[in-house]
A protein has these predicted regions:
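Hydrophobic alpha-helical transmembrane segments of multi-pass membrane proteins
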Residues: 38-54, 70-72
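Helix-coil boundary and interhelical linker segments in multi-pass alpha-helical membrane proteins
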Residues: 51-62, 117-124
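Polytopic alpha-helical membrane-helix bundles and their juxtamembrane interface segments
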Residues: 1-34, 83-85, 91-166
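Short, hydrophobic transmembrane alpha-helix segments
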Residues: 29-37, 52-59
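Membrane-water interface of transmembrane alpha-helices
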Residues: 67-85
Length: 166
């Protein structure tokens, strides 16, 4: 196996990518332990990724998603600090599979018109896939705020596909 391509890519990362990566990893670790501070690191990571999505990768739906993450990070921080009525910690939940099926089908259908707009009016690349991943990421973020355990399944699939886009 030739690792020179991997080395070249790692060596070619700029400050925004490194800051985005490091704060993103901290975000995931803190979210795993249900620490509200995770949202602060998520906001920083999203700002860096938004910049790169626009300037280098031309993934406009993803750039919009990062803007959404910045806003939702503030909401998530507030929700996780506030907790439940009476100061109780927000519990971890699991949503029914039918709900996930409906959301996945809905995101797939909504991706067609949204991707058409992005392809027609911007220099977006990979319009449908970028849009589908963006919509599913919005849903996964909602699940994370709700502390739904299934958010991790979404993130594993979404991030695996994003690796190929970047």
């Amino acid at each position: 196996m030739d690792f020179s391509l991997l080395y070249d890519q790692i060596a070619g990362q700029d400050a925004f990518e490194w800051i985005g990566l490091i704060t993103g990893v901290i975000y995931v670790i803190l979210a795993t332990y249900e620490k509200p501070a995770c949202w602060i690191f998520g906001i920083i990571s999203s700002g860096c990724i938004a910049w790169k999505s626009i300037t280098d990768y031309h993934l406009m739906a993803d750039a919009g998603l990062q803007g959404f993450y910045i806003v939702i990070g503030v909401i998530g921080l507030r929700q996780w600090i506030k907790g439940q009525p009476g100061g109780l910690k927000k519990p971890v939940i699991i949503s029914p599979w039918k709900q996930h099926l409906m959301v996945i089908v809905g995101c797939g259908l909504l991706s067609w018109p949204v991707s058409w707009l992005l392809i027609t009016y911007t220099d977006a690349r990979y319009g449908y896939v970028d849009t589908l991943l963006t919509l599913l990421s919005v849903w996964a973020t909602i699940l994370l705020i709700r502390k739904d355990l299934h958010n991790w399944v979404y993130w594993i699939v979404i991030d695996t596909v994003y690796v190929f886009l970047y």
